[in-house]
Amino acid sequence: MVRTTASFGTSSSFVLRLGQTLFSSASLLFMCFNDDEDFYAYTTFCYLVTVMGLVTPWSVTLALMEAYSILVKKLPMQATVISVIVAGDFVLSFLSLGGACSTASVAVLLMDAGEKQCDRYKLSATMAFLSSFLSFASTFFNFCLLPSLMSH
């Protein structure tokens, strides 16, 4: 079995998962802790909160699996498990990218709403972008691991 640099069960993959967890949690917190009463009037903000609410537990769960795999060094690598992880990362990375793009565009349009709120929305969109890129990287590395698992 050929392992790539950040494939499932390696320490670099664990770091990717921790980064996803950190950035998705930060994005969620920046969106939720605001004092703007019109927050729920914008669908894009609610969408980003929903997506980051999905990405955070996904990343935490996989980070725990990665940590267990690194510590025990005996987690069986099955093609179906890695396929589910690749599919989940792929879907969630596109959902978070869409949420980040829509939030960033609405934040730019709402510049007259006040600097404090727009800066918070832009910061949340930036954290969502970073989480999305780490999820794309994780998808790519685990996808490269799949052919070697299929041959066994």
From Swiss-Prot:
Record topology, Cytoplasmic segments: 1-12, 66-80, 148-152
Residue intervals passing through the bilayer: 13-33, 45-65, 81-101, 127-147
Pfam families: CASP_dom
Protein family (similarity comment): Belongs to the Casparian strip membrane proteins (CASP) family.
Keyword Transmembrane helix part of the UniProt annotation: yes
InterPro entries documented for this protein: CASP_dom, CASPL-5
Membrane topology annotation: Multi-pass membrane protein
Parts of the chain on the Extracellular side: 34-44, 102-126
Keywords, comma-separated and alphabetical: Cell membrane, Membrane, Transmembrane, Transmembrane helix
GO CC term (a single one): plasma membrane
Descriptive protein name: CASP-like protein 5C1
Main location: membrane
Species this protein is from: Arabidopsis thaliana (Mouse-ear cress)
Subunit structure: Homodimer and heterodimers.
Keyword flag Transferase: no
